[in-house]
Structure formats: C-alpha cells, structure tokens
C-alpha cells in the first residue's frame, strides 16, 4: 500500500543554478547530491546511456515532509515547455512558510517572476481553514506556490 509522498522531483536545465535558487533564495537546506548512471538508470528512465545529476533539498527535518529532488539529465536534450496551471500535469508544488510577506519581498528583490501578490483565502466553512498564498516561477519556469496557513 502507498504510505506517503516520499519526494517531489523537478527536472531542471541547470542543476547548480537551481540549487542556488532553492537554497539561497527559498531557504531550503541542501541535503546532498548523487550521480545516476548504468543499466538500472537506463531501465528506470527508458533511455540508453542515461546520466543524471540529482540534488536533494528540504525545508523541514520532519519525516513526513518530502524533500524536493532536482534532476538534471547530462548530455540529454531537455524538452522545455512553459508550466501552465491549466494543463493536465503537475501544475505546481506548494511550499509552506510562516512569513509569506518576507518571502514575497525576497523573491521580488531577487527578480523572481511572481504571478500575483499574496492573496487571502478563507476555506474555513469547507474545513480547510484560512491561508495566504501566491504563485511564482523557478529559474526554469516551473510554477511553485508559497502558502502560509493562518
């Protein structure tokens, strides 16, 4: 049976740039990097001579908090398509904060594309409570959400 989400994977075009963004701008802790290659990797990704750099970052020490896994395929053409909230796929990854205004300010100061300012939502009547949230893009254009439960 499925127990929980173990990690969330984002394919990136430049692993070093993405590590810097998620670590230095978003404040996630760099946990380490691995290099994948060999027969198992080829089978897993269904690509001959597949090689990948993989980095793990997390903002929480809690076991239930899945890490963000960034993967850059080496010597492979990346099919870059702009993330879109209205396309069938994983539309965004939501990150937690306890100070959404300071995160938003830091993103703006670092010229990160934010799709809006933080917005207030009240879903208390539906059992989900109140929050503030906004969407923004990482260096590859992947849509992320920042949320602060209230």
Positions of the model-derived regions?
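Core segments of cupin and vicinal oxygen chelate
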Residues: 11-64, 129
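Conserved long hydrophobic alpha-helices within structured protein cores
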Residues: 20-36, 66-72, 103-118
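General N-terminal targeting signals
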Residues: 22, 27, 45-47, 73-74, ...
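A short, acidic/glycine-rich surface segment
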Residues: 38-43, 76-81, 121-127
């Amino acid at each position: 049976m499925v127990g929980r989400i173990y990690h969330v994977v984002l394919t990136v075009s430049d692993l070093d740039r993405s590590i810097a963004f998620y670590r230095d701008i978003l404040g996630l802790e760099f946990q380490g990097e691995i290099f994948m290659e060999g027969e198992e990797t080829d089978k897993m990704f269904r690509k001959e001579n597949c090689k990948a750099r993989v980095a793990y970052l997390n903002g929480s020490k809690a076991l239930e908090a899945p890490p963000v896994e960034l993967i850059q395929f080496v010597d492979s053409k990346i099919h870059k398509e702009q993330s879109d909230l209205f396309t069938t796929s994983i539309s965004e990854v939501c990150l937690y904060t306890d100070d959404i205004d300071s995160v938003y300010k830091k993103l703006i100061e670092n010229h990160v594309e934010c799709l809006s300012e933080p917005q207030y939502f009240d879903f208390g009547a539906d059992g989900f409570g109140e929050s503030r949230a906004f969407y923004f893009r990482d260096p590859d254009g992947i849509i992320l959400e920042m949320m602060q439960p209230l």
